[in-house]
C-alpha cells in the first residue's frame, strides 16, 4: 500500500462490521484508524440493539422462570421488577462489553478518532470533533460500517414523550401498563415478549398476514400460539392511518377503521442506513431509499477503494454476519481478493420468549423445490434435562433428504434454541458425506442434556423411512 496517506485504511463505525474490518486490517499490518461518532466503541449493537435487548430479555425470562417454578409457587414469593431495574442490568452488560472492545483496539494499536465524518473527496474525510473543531484525514481505502437506525416516517412525532423507537425505548422513564408495538418483525416480537413477560398489556400490530414469515411455518405458528397464550393481542394485515400523541398516552388509528389507545407506542417497523451524513454525493456514491449501499462479493461499492459492510448494505443485517463481512472486506482490501466468504446457510437467532433459531431450508422451501425430504422431531417435554430445569416448552425439528440422509434444515423453538442450533449447523457444514442425520444416531451424547434432542429427533425421522 502507498504511504502517502495518513492511513492505509479508515473504518467508519465501530460496531461488529467495523470491528471485524479494523481487526482484520491491523492483523495484516495496515495502518488503520476507526472513526466513531459516539464516546464509546461498540456501535448500535452494543449500546442500543443486540446487547441491551438480549440483557433485558434474559432478566425478564429469569423472572418468568422463577414465578412459574413449582418450587416457588407460594404467591407471596412472586418476583416483581420495574423496567428501570432490568435496564440497570442491561447497563452493566453494556459497560462490560464496551470495556472489552475498547481493549481490542488498544492492544492492536488501532487508533480511534471521535467525531462525525463526511467525505470531502474520494480519499479525504472531514472529521467534526466533539469540541466543534474540524480536522481532515486521508486514506488510500475506506470501509463504511456506520450501521443503521430505526426508520422514522415523517408523519409520526417521535418527539412526543410516549412515542418510542427501538433505540429510545431503552430510555423509558415510566412504567407502562399497556403498550402498542407497531411492526411484528424480529425487534417487535422480541419486545412483545419482554413487555408481556413484565405483565404489560401488548397490542402487536403486524402489517403482514403472519408473524416472521421467513421462518418455517411451524416455528411461526408456535410463536403466534405462545403470544396468544400469554395474552399478547396480535392484529394481522393492519397499517396505521394516523398516530396521535395525547397527554396520557398514544392513540393509533388503523386504516381498517379500528382505534387503539395505550400508555405508549413502540414503533419498530424497519431501519435506515446511517449514510445521510457521509456526504456521499461528494464522491458520486448513491444509496437506495433506505440509505443502503450496493456492494459486490468482496464488499466493494461502485468505487473499488471504498468498501461497505454490516447493516448499511442490508440483508442479512445480523451482528454475527457483519463481523464476518468486515473480516472478509479487510482481506480483500489488502490482498485484492478474499479466500473467506460468508457461509451460505447463516443461522438465525430470534430472542423472543421462548427463543427461535433456524439454519438451512424450511419445509415450505423444500416442498416448493420438490425435494423428497423427511422430518424428525424432538419435543423438549420428553427430554430429561428440560424436565429437570423446568423448561419443557419447545421442539427441535430436523429436515433431511429421504435418500441421501443429508440434513437440509434445522429449526428449534424453545429456551436456548440459539445455542442448540449450532450443534446441527456444525454437521450441516461438513463436506464429503459428513453431513448426514445418521451422525446423531451414531454419536454418544452427554446425559441429561438439551443436545440429546438431536438424537431423539434423528431416531424419530429415520423411523419414518420405509
UniProtKB/Swiss-Prot annotation:
It is an enzyme of class 1 (oxidoreductase). GO terms for biological process: 2-oxoglutarate metabolic process; NADP metabolic process. One of its GO terms (cellular component) is cytosol. Binds 1 FAD per subunit. Disulfide bonds: none annotated. It is found in: Cytoplasm. Its cofactor is FAD. Its EC number is 1.6.1.1. FAD binds at residues 36-45. It comes from the Bacteria. Conversion of NADPH, generated by peripheral catabolic pathways, to NADH, which can enter the respiratory chain for energy generation. Belongs to the class-I pyridine nucleotide-disulfide oxidoreductase family. This is Soluble pyridine nucleotide transhydrogenase.
Amino acid at each position: 500500500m502507498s504511504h502517502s496517506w495518513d492511513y492505509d485504511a479508515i473504518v467508519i463505525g465501530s460496531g461488529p462490521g467495523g470491528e471485524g474490518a479494523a481487526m482484520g486490517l491491523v492483523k495484516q499490518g495496515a495502518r488503520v484508524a476507526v472513526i466513531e461518532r459516539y464516546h464509546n466503541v461498540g456501535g448500535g449493537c452494543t449500546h442500543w440493539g443486540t446487547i441491551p435487548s438480549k440483557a433485558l430479555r434474559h432478566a425478564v425470562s429469569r423472572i418468568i422462570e422463577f414465578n412459574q417454578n413449582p418450587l416457588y409457587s407460594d404467591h407471596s414469593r412472586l418476583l416483581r421488577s420495574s423496567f428501570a431495574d432490568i435496564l440497570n442490568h442491561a447497563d452493566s452488560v453494556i459497560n462490560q462489553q464496551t470495556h472489552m472492545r475498547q481493549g481490542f483496539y488498544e492492544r492492536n494499536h488501532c487508533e480511534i478518532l471521535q467525531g462525525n465524518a463526511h467525505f470531502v473527496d474520494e480519499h479525504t474525510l472531514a472529521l467534526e470533533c466533539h469540541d466543534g473543531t474540524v480536522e481532515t484525514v486521508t486514506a488510500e481505502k475506506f470501509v463504511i460500517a456506520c450501521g443503521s437506525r430505526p426508520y422514522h416516517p415523517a408523519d409520526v412525532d417521535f418527539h412526543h414523550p410516549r412515542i418510542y423507537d427501538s433505540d429510545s425505548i431503552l430510555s423509558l422513564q415510566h412504567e407502562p401498563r399497556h403498550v402498542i408495538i407497531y411492526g411484528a418483525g424480529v425487534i417487535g416480537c422480541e419486545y412483545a415478549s419482554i413487555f408481556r413477560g413484565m405483565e404489560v398489556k401488548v397490542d402487536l400490530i403486524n402489517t403482514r398476514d403472519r408473524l416472521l414469515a421467513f421462518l418455517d411455518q411451524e416455528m411461526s405458528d408456535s410463536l403466534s400460539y405462545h403470544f396468544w397464550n400469554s395474552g399478547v393481542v396480535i392484529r394481522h394485515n393492519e397499517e396505521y392511518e394516523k398516530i396521535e400523541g395525547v397527554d396520557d398516552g398514544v392513540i393509533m388509528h388503523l386504516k381498517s377503521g379500528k382505534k387503539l389507545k395505550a400508555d405508549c407506542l413502540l414503533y419498530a417497523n424497519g431501519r435506515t442506513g446511517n449514510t445521510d451524513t457521509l456526504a456521499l454525493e461528494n464522491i458520486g456514491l448513491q444509496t437506495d431509499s433506505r440509505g443502503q449501499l450496493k456492494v459486490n462479493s468482496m464488499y466493494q461499492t461502485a468505487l473499488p477503494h471504498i468498501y461497505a459492510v454490516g447493516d448499511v448494505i442490508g440483508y442479512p443485517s445480523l451482528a454475527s454476519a457483519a463481523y464476518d463481512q468486515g473480516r472478509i472486506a479487510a482481506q480483500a482490501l489488502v490482498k485484492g481478493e478474499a479466500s473467506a466468504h460468508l457461509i451460505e446457510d447463516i443461522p438465525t437467532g430470534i430472542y423472543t420468549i421462548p427463543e427461535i433459531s433456524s439454519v438451512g431450508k424450511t419445509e415450505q422451501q423444500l416442498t416448493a423445490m420438490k425435494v423428497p425430504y423427511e422430518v424428525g422431531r424432538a419435543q423438549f417435554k420428553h427430554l430429561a434435562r428440560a424436565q429437570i430445569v423446568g423448561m419443557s416448552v419447545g421442539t427441535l425439528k430436523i429436515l433431511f433428504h429421504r435418500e441421501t440422509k443429508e440434513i437440509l434444515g434445522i429449526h428449534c423453538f424453545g429456551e436456548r434454541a440459539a445455542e442448540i442450533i449450532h450443534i446441527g449447523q456444525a454437521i450441516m457444514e461438513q463436506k464429503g458425506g459428513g453431513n448426514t442425520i445418521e451422525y446423531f444416531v451414531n454419536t454418544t451424547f452427554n446425559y441429561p442434556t438439551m443436545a440429546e434432542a438431536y438424537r431423539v429427533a434423528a431416531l424419530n425421522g429415520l423411523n419414518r423411512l420405509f
